[in-house]
């Protein structure tokens, strides 16, 4: 019987894999705690101590803990340390779901980041959006900048990470 798995490329070992072509580099950003928060975001902010509505596509996130805006009533809380909020429904009117294993995070950095963004999406990188949820290379991702304008993070469903990695390998801007 034919082995159909032979026609697909092997998934990279994301813990060590890096791409670097020209002035853009891509790597996996591991070790982040990710919580999907749905519901009353004002109550979430009070309980978590994270203020604001979260960054949207193209906006710059900073700090050890921050929020990424997905929709009017939904954010992804991201942090280097675990959050002191338990998963599940909270009587204050919000629900928390741990997404650490569900979302893969790529960090893309370099002066040609704008060209890569233009290649992957129709988003105008000069016009930040309230929501970080965009279609990038045909996959739904959360896109925002981190720390400065030449570094971005993409959160993608873990099952789509090998596809997005292959797309990034073949992108002519890299």
Language model features with spans:
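Basic, glycine/lysine-rich polyanion-binding surfaces/domains
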Residues: 1-174
């Amino acid at each position: 019987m034919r082995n159909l798995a032979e026609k697909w490329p092997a998934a990279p070992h994301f813990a060590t894999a890096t791409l670097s072509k020209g002035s853009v580099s891509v790597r996996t950003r591991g070790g982040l705690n990710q919580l999907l928060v749905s519901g009353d975001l004002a109550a979430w902010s009070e309980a978590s101590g994270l203020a604001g509505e979260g960054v949207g596509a193209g906006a710059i996130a900073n700090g050890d803990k921050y929020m990424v805006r997905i929709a009017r009533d939904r954010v992804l809380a991201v942090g280097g340390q675990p959050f002191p909020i338990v998963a599940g429904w909270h009587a204050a009117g919000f629900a928390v779901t741990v997404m650490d294993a569900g979302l893969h995070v790529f960090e893309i950095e370099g002066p040609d980041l704008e060209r890569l963004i233009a290649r992957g999406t129709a988003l105008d990188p000069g016009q930040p959006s309230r929501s970080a949820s965009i279609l990038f290379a045909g996959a739904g991702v959360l896109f925002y900048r981190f720390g400065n304008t030449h570094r971005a993070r993409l959160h993608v469903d873990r099952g789509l990470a090998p596809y997005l990695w292959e797309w990034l390998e073949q992108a002519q801007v890299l």
